[in-house]
Amino acid sequence: MKIVFATDSDYEYIRNRDPHISESLILSKIKGNEIYILRNQDESNIGWMRYGYFWDNTPFMNMIWVDEQYRDKGAGKQVVLFWEEQMKQKGFNLIMTSTQADEGAQHFYRKLGYKDAGCLILDTQPLEILLTKNLN
């Protein structure tokens, strides 16, 4: 698998799979190198990961998407570890992510060393678990 920064040519692929972000923000994140594209050996897109900054100073992984037929084969773990290394190289010591309490992703992140750091209660959604990881 290959991990690269998303470009304008990846816009439709991302837009068609990410209902949680506005179309204009996708373009902004592409230009800011805040979306990674996962590609298979044929150079076909198989997934993506996007991030931002919590409090504008702590890298926060917003979402990982892996196309159905490529799931459970290590692509998610690979992109998380890649992102962690990128953030470490940029000088960050702490990173964050979150997942809903009714999703299995919480176990995935804990296996990768993320620790529960709190939660967010929203009116219409399950509890959102905040997770952090120290990169030192």
Each predicted region: which residue ranges?
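A general lysine-centric signal
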Residues: 94, 133-134
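Acetyl-CoA-dependent GNAT
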Residues: 4-62, 67, 86, 118, ...
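Conserved GNAT acetyl-CoA-binding A-motif
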Residues: 87-100
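Conserved acetyl-CoA-binding loop-helix of GNAT-fold acetyltransferases
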Residues: 72-85, 110-111
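A short, internal acetyl-CoA/4′-phosphopantetheine-binding micro-motif in the GNAT/acyltransferase core
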Residues: 64-71, 100
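Conserved active-site alpha-helix within GNAT-family acetyltransferase domains
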Residues: 77, 101-118, 123-127
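Short loop/turn motifs at secondary-structure junctions
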Residues: 60, 91-93, 113
